[in-house]
């Protein structure tokens, strides 16, 4: 793709998200979503092949449907309240439709089916944008309308997302699909705490983006797309493979690592709000996620898949320098000791 065209497209994606996050007018928010959607399609189809085209079409249809639902909710709200401002959604029907539309944009269960399919069909770089940047705009709107959201619907979708995110990843050998199911589970954790403590949702989003960014950058660095190619990376770059496995465990929420912090704080916050059954269920279902991460770690580090790979350890004559990677790896694995500083969230 021409660098100038790519720059314009990326700027439009950035501008669309910024318009959504900065607007207090529903029509401007809708326009921002549409700008973002139309600009992201060429990025998803950057490496043109039938899989990428199919993935882009699925993404477009899902997001366009969600945008139509959002516009319908905006019009219902306008008819009842007579105003376009985002301060409060006055009508319960509008609130429910709006929540469902934004859940579809985020990929919460039961609107999650597009996430693994689209992520698998596109390149690692496009997948990185899809699973990080594209979550910001819908989550910022949910954050702003959190007092008006129907709690039961949101919690049901959250619990189902954590369950599906863990269950779906169990059978996978494709790293992009594993990251997609992980994204669904993380979105579930964010949705569960949104009504009780929206600031904690934003903290969870920040840590999720850092971990996902680290994972995709390591995958791009090592050119890994399957568990088999990941196990072969031991011969080329043992340090990179070790860092991938540590970051994977952090995404699963293993206690000494950064990924445990948001789960711990969310369970603590839910317990403070006299909710016992919900955090217990969430903690049990999070074990599914942790299980497939640990299985991936085990199969990559302690066993080798049957292969005809007889080469010795490769010496790296050409090393790719990625300046951003070391601080991201540190942030993705060693943030847990900073948890006491977050008492400000209370």
Swiss-Prot record:
Q: Which GO terms describe its molecular function?
A: NADH dehydrogenase (ubiquinone) activity
Q: Is the keyword Zinc assigned to this protein?
A: no
State any GO BP term from the record: mitochondrial respiratory chain complex I assembly
**Topological relation to the membrane, as annotated:** Multi-pass membrane protein
Q: Which InterPro entries match?
A: Complex_I_Subunit_2, NADH_DH_su2_C, NADH_UbQ_OxRdtase_chain2, ND/Mrp_TM
Quick one: signal sequence residues? Answer: none
Where does the protein end up? Mitochondrion inner membrane
Question: What EC number is given for this enzyme?
Answer: 7.1.1.2
Q: Which class of enzymes does this protein belong to?
A: translocase
Q: Name one GO cellular component term.
A: mitochondrial inner membrane
Bilayer-crossing regions: 3-23, 25-45, 59-79, 96-116, 122-142, 149-169, 178-198, 200-220, 237-257, 274-294, 322-342
Catalytic activity entry: a ubiquinone + NADH + 5 H(+)(in) = a ubiquinol + NAD(+) + 4 H(+)(out)
Subunit and partners: Core subunit of respiratory chain NADH dehydrogenase (Complex I) which is composed of 45 different subunits. Interacts with TMEM242.
Task: State what this protein does.
Answer: Core subunit of the mitochondrial membrane respiratory chain NADH dehydrogenase (Complex I) which catalyzes electron transfer from NADH through the respiratory chain, using ubiquinone as an electron acceptor. Essential for the catalytic activity and assembly of complex I.
Entry protein name: NADH-ubiquinone oxidoreductase chain 2
**What gene name is listed for this protein?**
MT-ND2
């Amino acid at each position: 793709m021409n660098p100038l065209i790519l720059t314009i497209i990326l700027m439009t994606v950035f501008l669309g998200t910024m318009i959504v996050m900065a607007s207090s007018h529903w029509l401007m928010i809708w326009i921002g979503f549409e700008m973002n959607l139309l600009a992201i399609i060429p990025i998803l189809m950057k490496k043109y092949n039938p899989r990428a085209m199919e993935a882009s079409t699925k993404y477009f249809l899902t997001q366009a449907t969600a945008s139509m639902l959002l516009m319908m909710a905006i019009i219902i709200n306008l008819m009842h309240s007579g105003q376009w401002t985002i301060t409060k959604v006055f009508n319960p029907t509008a609130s429910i439709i709006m929540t469902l539309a934004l859940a579809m944009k985020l990929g919460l269960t039961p609107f999650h089916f597009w996430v693994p399919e689209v992520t698998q069909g596109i390149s690692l770089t496009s997948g990185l944008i899809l699973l990080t940047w594209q979550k910001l705009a819908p989550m910022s709107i949910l954050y702003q309308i959190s007092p008006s959201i129907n709690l039961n619907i949101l919690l049901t979708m959250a619990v189902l997302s954590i369950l599906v995110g863990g269950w779906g990843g169990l059978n996978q050998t494709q790293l992009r699909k594993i990251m997609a199911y992980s994204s669904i589970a993380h979105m579930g954790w964010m949705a569960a705490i949104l009504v009780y403590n929206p600031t904690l949702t934003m903290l969870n989003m920040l840590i999720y983006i850092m971990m996902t960014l680290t994972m995709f950058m390591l995958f791009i660095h090592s050119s890994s797309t399957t568990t088999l190619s990941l196990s072969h990376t031991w011969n080329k770059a043992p340090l990179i493979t070790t860092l991938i496995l540590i970051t994977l465990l952090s995404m699963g929420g293993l206690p000494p690592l950064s990924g445990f912090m948001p789960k711990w704080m969310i369970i603590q916050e839910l317990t403070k709000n006299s909710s016992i059954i919900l955090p217990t269920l969430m903690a049990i279902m999070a074990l599914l996620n942790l299980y497939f991460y640990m299985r991936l770690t085990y199969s990559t580090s302690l066993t080798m898949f049957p292969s005809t790979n007889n080469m010795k350890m490769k010496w790296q004559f050409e090393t790719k320098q990625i300046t951003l990677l070391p601080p991201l790896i540190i942030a993705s694995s060693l943030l847990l000791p900073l948890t006491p500083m977050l008492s400000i969230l209370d």
